[in-house]
Design a protein with these regions (language model features):
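Phosphate-group recognition and catalysis centered on beta-loop-alpha active-site segments
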Residues: 1-225
């Protein structure tokens, strides 16, 4: 099985101003990235926009424009940064792409059952993954620390959510989550892998489904053919 390559934040690499832009997506598609990863937020006015950080104005790139730039080959790796109304963002992607080219990830536990319920009618078979990234938390400092600590031990969370894909930081995947995913027959999506040695390792791993990287050109060159 060939490990798929997902271009993180549109595959802009070290070009931070170019992250999550239509130009970055188009470049990653030309490179041959299998999927393009992008973060989805809601602007202050309620528009669905793409960008790493929560928007403070209306200058963000529209989600619909990024999806249109994927063309007819690359898949969408939709990383939701929304705690409510998630289905509205996913609906934009589902309207434009076939389901076998979409994977939706989030760090919000409650998003998975809501999206699952929505998908039964609107997108049956939609792949949903809960990330080991820390959940958003605005509580006290101890509760925020607990949320970050829990991110390193996500198996119970993933089991309760009923995920279709295990979305893991590369260190957590290497030490214990990869074997857990394998025992349950779940595909493994590893993030964010940038070093040459690490890319060579993960793109050759028979138990990995997808690797997210800021350098899709390097990953594609190292991936066994």
């Amino acid at each position: 099985m060939t490990v798929l390559v997902s271009a993180h934040r549109g595959g802009a690499g070290n070009n931070r101003p170019g992250e999550n832009t239509v130009a970055a997506v188009e470049r990653a598609v030309r490179l041959g990235a299998d999927y393009i990863e992008f973060d989805v937020h809601r602007s202050p006015a309620g528009r669905l926009v793409v960008g790493h950080d929560a928007p403070t104005d209306e200058s963000g790139v529209l989600l619909s424009d990024v999806v249109a730039a994927l063309g007819d080959r690359a898949g969408a790796h939709v990383d939701l940064k929304l705690a409510t109304g998630e289905h509205e963002a996913v609906a934009v992607v589902v309207a434009a792409l076939p389901l076998d080219r979409i994977v939706v990830t989030t760090s919000e536990d409650s998003s998975i059952p809501r999206l699952r319920a929505w998908s039964v009618e609107h997108a049956p078979g939609l792949m949903l993954g809960l990330s080991t990234a820390a959940r958003s938390h605005r509580g006290t400092r101890p509760s925020r620390w607990l949320a970050k600590t829990a991110a390193w031990f996500p198996r119970a969370r993933m089991r309760r959510a009923g995920v279709d894909v295990v979305v893991s930081h590369q260190l957590i995947a290497r030490y214990w989550l990869r074997s857990w995913a394998r025992r349950r027959g779940l595909p493994l999506l590893v993030w964010t892998v940038d070093g040459t040695d690490a890319l060579r390792y993960w793109t050759s791993d028979p138990h990995t489904w997808m690797v997210t990287t800021n350098h899709p050109d390097v990953a594609l060159a190292l991936r066994p053919h």
